[in-house]
Design a protein with these regions (language model features):
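Sec/Tat signal peptide C-region and signal peptidase I cleavage site
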Residues: 29-33
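Exposed, interaction-prone regions of secreted/extracellular proteins
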Residues: 34-372
Length: 372
């Protein structure tokens, strides 16, 4: 028979357990409550400073180390092991706008005149800072170290409709161009947030591919024909890789994400998207356009969801953009731009504020701020 003392002690323990369970249920409800209309996408729960730093270090590590084999993989903090995941088709509707590559600011005369008058320009379509290393790049990591005042973002399809784009330069010719002397290649590492779902994939381009007569039908088998090249001869061709599904992320949570791209000549191209405590990666052969042979500039930003569209932020939004490179050097890279720079045809409604800073480090980087 239990003594009254032991019985009382057990009763107190039971009360404590019940109280902790009630508290846990309350906390869980708060963390996983149904999102509001303006925050329909993933929102990370708050963590303390030490845990936040640990998670940030994990995101940096995962962004720099993709899976060793082709395919789609995911990982969850704190594990650094990639687990095989299903690959899906990239969004069929997605196609980045083909920017002009010959005129000042992509052939937009109105844009050029406004620049000459000293007017601020919205980011994208030729108005942005890009990073350039002393030689070829083997990888870059894009992030947003500081995000303030952002409560909403709207794209052509609704709230949280945008892309994170990490783009290579598009003035290089590789063996993929065959004997077409005007042909150049371009590659985009993309995270697409499409209102309620997300995808991570790579889009490849061939510009001015084919014969000197714009007869059409010259794209390689399996590629999509984007029409006659507006600046040269031949056709513009594009194709998407497979994709890995990821959550849509609320624009207010951009400080928790990173997008990276890495290439190995004769090996694999890899893109990694990290979101809070989860990472998603896709790996394909570099031989698609052989971008490793010509990649020397990188553009990273948040812009519209393809087709030359815009990502529109609420008034009072400020975002700091960081683009860190791997180029075999610890020297400070070069800030290129903002005029006549960048490679995407998409935009946002923010303007560049202040200058671009370039910093040498184990992973050299540039950093700049945009706001409205």
């Amino acid at each position: 028979m239990q003594s009254k003392s032991k019985s009382g002690t057990r009763y107190m323990i039971q009360l404590a357990i019940m109280a902790s369970l009630v508290g846990a249920i309350g906390t869980s409800s708060a963390v996983f409550a149904a999102p509001t209309d303006n925050e329909a996408a993933f929102t990370a729960p708050p963590v303390n400073a030490a845990e936040a730093q640990a998670q940030e270090s994990w995101r940096v590590d995962m962004a720099r180390h993709g899976a060793p084999a082709e395919g789609c993989y995911s990982a969850s903090y704190p594990s650094i092991l990639w687990k095989k995941a299903a690959c899906v088709a990239a969004p069929a509707k997605y196609r980045s706008k083909v920017p002009s590559r010959s005129g000042s600011v992509f052939g937009d005369s109105t844009h050029t005149k406004s620049q000459a008058a000293g007017h601020a320009q919205t980011v994208g379509n030729g108005e942005v800072f890009v990073v350039q290393g002393p030689g070829l790049l083997s990888g870059t990591v894009g992030s947003f170290p500081t995000v303030s005042g952002v409560t909403s973002e709207t794209g052509s399809d609704g709230s949280n409709d945008y892309t994170l784009q990490l783009n290579t330069n598009f003035n290089g010719t590789t063996s993929t161009c065959k004997s077409y002397s005007y042909c150049t290649v371009w590659q985009q590492f993309i995270y697409e947030s499409d209102v309620s779902s997300g995808y991570v994939f790579i889009q490849y381009w061939l510009f001015s591919y084919g014969s000197s007569t714009r007869s059409g039908g010259t794209c390689p088998s399996g590629w999509n024909d984007a029409g006659a090249d507006p600046d040269g001869i031949g056709e513009d061709c594009y194709v998407n890789s497979s994709a890995i599904s990821a959550p849509a992320v609320a624009a207010s949570q951009l400080a928790n994400v990173k997008l990276s791209g890495s290439v190995v000549s004769g090996g694999n191209d890899t893109t990694v998207f990290t979101n809070g405590t989860t990472a998603y990666t896709l790996t394909t052969k570099d031989s698609k356009v052989n971008i490793a042979a010509v990649w020397n500039q990188s553009e990273f930003n948040i812009v519209g969801d393809g087709g030359g569209s815009a990502a529109t932020f609420n008034t009072g939004s400020t975002i700091t953009v960081k683009d860190a490179v791997t180029d075999g050097s610890t020297s400070a890279p070069t800030c290129v731009g903002p005029s006549d720079a960048g490679f995407t045809g998409e935009t946002n409604n923010l303007t560049l504020t202040g200058s671009c800073t370039a910093t040498g480090a184990s992973s050299p980087y540039i950093q700049f701020t945009e706001s409205n």
